[in-house]
């Protein structure tokens, strides 16, 4: 007997696109753009819940814990994508934000049959990463019923983790399984059931908020500058200089000299220049300030 998906918003037909196969290219992209515009409005109704997830993630980081994103298919790929962007953007170890996709790395580029239907696989994946009560597990599923995600959330709760769920159906199974439900109703997809569209867009926006918000709360930004950016290519080398210039008002040569004196740390260079101290003292200030530049600048001379 097949699953009953008829009650899910993500599986219903969109009345605006019943004649999609008869539309011109311009009509297709116009209706898609109009439907996509509904996504931020739907997310706006979930902001308090998203903010709670940001708080929990930041608290986990402060305790030495990690943030796990779990999903299958598009949902899992989005979690892996957002997790992979954290080390170069925020200078954190790759183990700090982890994206788990049902079926493993292979599933990122091709479907792995049956993987999303296995609760046990989720438990194995979390155990392999040594899940602890200090971690936060966020389950992602547009349908809100993916067994892999449900298994991960149940195991995480047994360990004592905070758990959150991101779904695109109201009253979802994963929303009920998690401590915190982030359920966004984007309406039916332009192409019926193709949740890589509006649902995927909504998930990506929410994941951006959780990852960025929690990193900002733990000192990874000064003003709106990403002060822990890693200089892994020429563009980022220049961006690092620009960040120091924007934060301090110094000339490029002085910005580069400060970065070099700080061992490549943009955050330390900014603290040196604004607190008028050397790299060693700037590092001590930042340690005392738990990595927050604004607080480090205000500290008394050590």
Language model region names:
Residues 43, 50-55:
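Phosphate-interacting basic helix/loop segments used at nucleotide- and nucleic-acid interfaces
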Residues 31-39, 99-110, 222, 263:
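Gly-rich Lys/Arg/Thr-decorated short loops/hinges at beta-loop-alpha junctions or inter-strand turns
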Residues 214-302:
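Short, amphipathic alpha-helical interaction segments embedded in low-complexity terminal/linker regions
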Residues 56, 152, 210:
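Aromatic/hydrophobic pocket-lining residues that form π-stacking "cages" and hydrophobic walls in ligand
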Residues 68-206, 214-218:
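Glycine-rich phosphate-binding loops that contact phosphosugars or nucleotide phosphates
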Residues 53-64, 130-132:
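Glycine-rich phosphate/diphosphate-binding loops that line cofactor/substrate pockets in enzymes
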Residues 1-42, 46:
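Cofactor-/ligand-binding subdomain signature composed of acidic, glycine-rich
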């Amino acid at each position: 007997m097949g699953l009953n998906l008829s009650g899910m918003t993500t599986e219903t037909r969109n009345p605006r696109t019943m004649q999609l196969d008869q539309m011109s290219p311009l009509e297709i992209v116009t209706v898609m753009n109009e439907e996509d515009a509904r996504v931020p409005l739907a997310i706006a109704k979930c902001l308090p819940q998203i903010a709670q997830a940001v708080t929990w993630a930041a608290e986990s980081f402060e305790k030495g814990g990690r943030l796990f994103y779990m999903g299958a298919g598009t949902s899992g790929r989005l979690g892996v994508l957002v997790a992979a962007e954290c080390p170069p953007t925020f200078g954190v170890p790759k183990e700090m934000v982890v994206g788990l996709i049902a079926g493993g790395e292979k599933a990122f580029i091709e479907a792995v049959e049956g993987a999303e239907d296995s609760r046990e696989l989720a438990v194995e994946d979390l155990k392999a990463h040594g899940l602890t009560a200090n971690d936060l597990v966020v389950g992602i599923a547009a349908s809100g019923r993916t067994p892999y995600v449900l298994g991960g959330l149940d195991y995480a709760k047994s360990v004592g983790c905070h758990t959150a769920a991101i779904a695109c159906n109201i009253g979802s199974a994963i929303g009920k399984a998690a401590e915190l439900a982030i359920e966004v109703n984007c309406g039916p997809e332009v192409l019926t059931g193709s949740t890589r569209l509006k649902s995927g867009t909504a998930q990506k926006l929410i994941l951006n908020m959780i990852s960025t918000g929690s990193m900002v709360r733990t000192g990874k930004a000064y003003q709106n500058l990403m002060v822990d950016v890693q200089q892994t290519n020429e563009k980022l080398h220049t961006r690092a200089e620009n960040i120091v210039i924007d934060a301090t008002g110094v000339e490029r040569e002085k910005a580069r000299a400060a970065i070099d004196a700080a061992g490549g740390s943009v955050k330390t260079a900014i603290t040196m220049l604004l607190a008028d101290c050397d790299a060693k003292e700037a590092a001590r200030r930042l340690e005392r300030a738990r990595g927050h530049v604004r607080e480090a600048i205000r500290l008394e001379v050590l």
